[in-house]
Amino acid sequence: MRVRAVLFRVLCALVACIAVASLTACLGPQPNRNPTAAFLALPQAGYAPLTVELDARASRDPDGDALTYEWTFDSADSASGAVVMRTFYAGTHTVELRVSDNRGGTDIATESIAAQAVPEGYVAHSFAWTAKGVPQTCTFLIPWDLYQMYKGRIRNTAAESYVYGDYVIDPLDDPTIEDYAGVFWARTDSVEAFVDYALAFVQGAIRYRPDPTRQEWPWYPLETLVAGEGDCEDSAILFVSLLRARGVSSSLAFVDTNSDRLPDHVLALVPVSEPWAARLTCSASLLMLDGVRYAVAETASDGLPIPLGCDPWGLSPDDVLQVWPF
């Protein structure tokens, strides 16, 4: 009897499966469901000309159908593809995305892009870098006359004649540097995070370029920002200037990296408390100078992220030949 019961249950299951399959066949294909259009615009606002990445890969089709992507800009120009780049000039612009499946289903999403005109007397310089593995961007407005004034200052080529600290404390660019530092400060939540963020900026957004022959002189921060590149002293001056603008202590240091007792490199030093030091990646590389614990900030990394406190030179206190504190 038990065998018969088992066979009966199996037979019933088979009949049910056949019935469901037959019902589906009788009813025909299920009705198509419309896709959902969605996209990201990065950045969504900035100074013109503003180049924006439009990414529609967040769009979805509930039936799993393949999608096509059609873009319309200000009800005029168009483009296609899941990811497109578009440059917008001054004004507010409307971007429309239409996604379609292969069975006639469609959906539309729209966003506005605000491209702000650059104020007269300024130039806009955009920067891109990575901080703790996350891509970052910003655009700084640079007063053109102030930049030209710094660029036009007469200098000589004798490196030993330079007081590098003078390039940090010059007062004319203080309000401008304070604005730039304020942008970074608003993106962080502590002094430690701000220092890390500013260091990542100068390492990643400012290309390392040795001074050309017969041009061995430092640059003021605005010169480095306009060029987007600089030698070790240029990036260190910029970094220390950003910290100074927010009242964060630091120093420029002229150091000996090859043990010949002659200065050959400029970097920054940041005084750190014992708890801060314990949180650093390279806490064993700290320098003690006059009883103060300093973390090395190597700004001329040529794009390589070197965390605060990591000393690529293996410096000792005797290798620090001159310091300009701020």
Predicted segments, located by residue:
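Secondary-structure boundary elements
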Residues: 158-227
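C-terminal edge beta-strand
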Residues: 109-116
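Hydrophobic/aromatic-rich core segments of domains that either
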Residues: 234-326
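Proline-centered linker/hinge motifs at extracellular inter-domain junctions
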Residues: 32-36
